[in-house]
């Protein structure tokens, strides 16, 4: 009986330590949206100190979009410890083959109808500033530079 109690106690302590280890790591809020009119958006936000803060950042960012764009589909919204591919390139400021809205704390890649994507990118950057962002700019494909 004592051995069973010791084993249970060790499992509980191990579970608590594992939870705090995961909860206290830093995470990047990333998400992908697709719209009915052919646009795809990949968003990367600045690193958050905890998983809860990361999830809250994704929710704060996506809630107004989902409210205004009923035809938009959230492909994913997750918290990543490490980035790769397009998301890593956005974070690092590497040139990418799509338009990107750059604002403090946010990089948003846009792909869509070629005849309209530039105008939409510039409009989105202007809307972010109107909405309270300190600055935002549309960066054209292949022209991003590392900070």
Regions found by a protein language model. Give the residues of each.
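N-terminal Sec-pathway targeting helices
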Residues: 1-11
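Mitochondrial intermembrane space
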Residues: 14-147
